[in-house]
Design a protein with these regions (language model features):
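Hydrophobic alpha-helical segments of small multi-pass membrane proteins
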Residues: 75-89, 105-116
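Core segments of alpha-helical transmembrane spans in multipass integral membrane proteins
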Residues: 16-26, 42-66, 77-87
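Juxtamembrane helix-break-helix junctions at the cytosolic face
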Residues: 32, 60-73, 93-94
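Membrane-interface helix termini and inter-helical loops of multi-pass transporters
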Residues: 30-41
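Membrane-interface helix-boundary motifs at transmembrane edges
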Residues: 2-6, 66-72, 98
């Protein structure tokens, strides 16, 4: 498949974004909520678990960037997870339970879910082509 360097940079970029987002929210969620005049969460431990998982999903994207041909299960998981994050954030933004700025990470996730889908489509298409002799 051509452009593997481009796709590696896509997965590496998302890895950095996701790890940074998970770490930042893990340590600064209450500060961010105060800044946005948003209500604090009742169960901080659940959000900390989620933010920790977000960080480790970023690590998984790093694994993908370093071995694109063998980590398609992680890519499929990423498509599902990122689409779900967007759907939840869009819903809660629409009904007014979260500040609209919280939708920005959801939009970023949706963009990467689309990019991941394009990658899988192109990769499977290129693998299905018969070898020319």
């Amino acid at each position: 498949m051509k452009n593997l360097a481009f796709w590696k940079s896509v997965f590496l970029t998302k890895s950095i974004i996701t790890c940074a987002e998970g770490a930042a929210l893990f340590f600064a969620d209450s500060w961010i909520r105060n800044l946005l005049n948003a209500q604090p969460l009742f169960n901080v431990e659940y959000s900390q678990l989620f933010f920790g998982l977000v960080f480790f999903i970023g690590v998984a994207y790093w694994w993908v960037a370093n071995d694109i041909s063998n980590n398609h299960g992680i890519i499929k998981f990423g498509i599902c997870a990122q689409s779900f994050v967007f759907a939840i954030l869009a819903y809660h933004t629409a009904i007014g339970t979260i500040h609209p700025l919280y939708l920005i990470p959801g939009i970023i996730d949706l963009i990467f879910a689309i990019l991941y889908s394009v990658f899988l489509f192109l990769y499977s298409y290129k693998q299905a082509e018969p070898a020319l002799e």
